Amino acid sequence: MVIAYIRNLIRKVIQRGMDHEHSALYPPAAVRGMKVLDRSAFEQEVTLPALLVPVQSLRNCRKMMKSKLVNLSINKKVVDPPAHLVGEELTAGHKLFLLKPGTTMETYSSDEKQMLGKLGVKDKIYDYRITLGYENYKHWDVLRAILPDSEMAARGFSQVGHILHVNLRDHQLPYKHIIGQVLLDKIQTARTVVNKHQNIDNKFRNFEMEVIAGENNFVTRIIEHGRKFEFDFSKVFWNSRLSTEHQRITNFVSESDVVFDVFAGVGPFAIPIAKKGCVVYANDLNPESYRWLLHNVALNKTKAKCFNSDGREFIQTELRNYLLTRSPHKVHVLMNLPAIAVEFLDVFRGLLCNGDCLAANDLSNASHKKLLSIPEVCVHLYIFAPEKDGIADLKSRIKQSLGCALPEDAVIYNVRNVAPKKQMYCVSFVLSQHWMDQKEQDVYEPAPKKIKECIS
């Protein structure tokens, strides 16, 4: 239902963009299909409706007419009235309010007209001529005017520091340089515009990209919820759209908890959690991510134990060793690699075994009693699933990898829509300690712990 609503909303936005083409403020039709940016081609003279307002009434009139002022990037929406338009006697002590095209006195209600009269506003609309140019249009107006596909202009972009990142389809590539230049011109904080060449399909989660405008500089800096991050965007993975999710998990964990971030990247989870006071073990296989992880830990003046190893090895060594210390602190295991993280779940089965595993139903075993003091382990698994029957799909894959069904009281949180018919979820559940000490799937397995203590 929500996805359908969003798609319908996008269609309406696109349609409004197409309808906007017929408005007086739309860029000239001659720019359609332009592939090399010619800023001078956007110049045109248009007529705007205007109201003559006494200077002493400017503040009150501005509040009253805010919704009717022209919606355009022009230096002034309140201008000096030219003598040839209003007469010499009215140039002093008055200003012209520039209004949206199509505004007439009939646009105003009787109450508004009465209020305007009390403020000394003449009951008359003036035609004000103004020259518009490239600098007066927003980036989406320029792109909608240039590109033959209105949807192309509405797709948007992601910004990572000074880098703007677009995903262009094959039929959009002939326009890539003009798209990049327009974005560079209009987004003041941008210095580099890149287009992704391919999907993320390598083991380090970064992708090939092409600079389509601006500097060939991929080392960037961002601030997310007050924490600073620096990294080479071409060599590591970063997704600004996960900012809310980073903060959600950070808010959830307690200061006394211990966190193992299996696929830590440059630290978007690990660093804010460490800043909170938690003990953090952060790992990433990508040497570049590991390098920037260390850098960002120092940059944020916090502490985290960082590792550059395979996720499976990290769990089998660092997590296992910590659990065997019988620490009383609750443990969280973050697995943010949604494409393949589910394939790592089998590593938890028999994780605590060291040669000799418990026999089935041997609940009196002395070593088993010791295991009862092992801290609670809450896994937060990120996973992609189809929009249709996605919950059933992810439950099936988790069961296949973990070797047992997902606890009924696990929390399945919809993080975001990543593509048409594709969702990203975070599945949070408490691992059975008995399961981590036994390799056989038919051994005794106690009822799962209630997840509500683990996540709200």
Swiss-Prot record:
Single GO molecular function: tRNA methyltransferase activity
One record GO biological process: mitochondrial tRNA methylation
PROSITE patterns: SAM_MT_TRM5_TYW2
Keywords, sorted A to Z: Cytoplasm, Methyltransferase, Mitochondrion, Nucleus, S-adenosyl-L-methionine, Transferase, tRNA processing
EC annotation from Swiss-Prot or TrEMBL: 2.1.1.228
Keyword presence, Cell membrane: no
InterPro entries linked: MeTrfase_TRM5/TYW2, SAM-dependent_MTases_sf, TRM5-TYW2-like_MTfase, TRM5/TYW2-like_N, tRNA_Gua_MeTrfase_euk
GO CC annotations on file: cytoplasm; mitochondrial matrix; nucleus
Subunit structure: Monomer.
Name of the protein this chain belongs to: tRNA (guanine(37)-N(1))-methyltransferase
Organism of this sequence: Ciona intestinalis (Transparent sea squirt)
High-level lineage: Eukaryota, Metazoa, Chordata, Tunicata, Ascidiacea
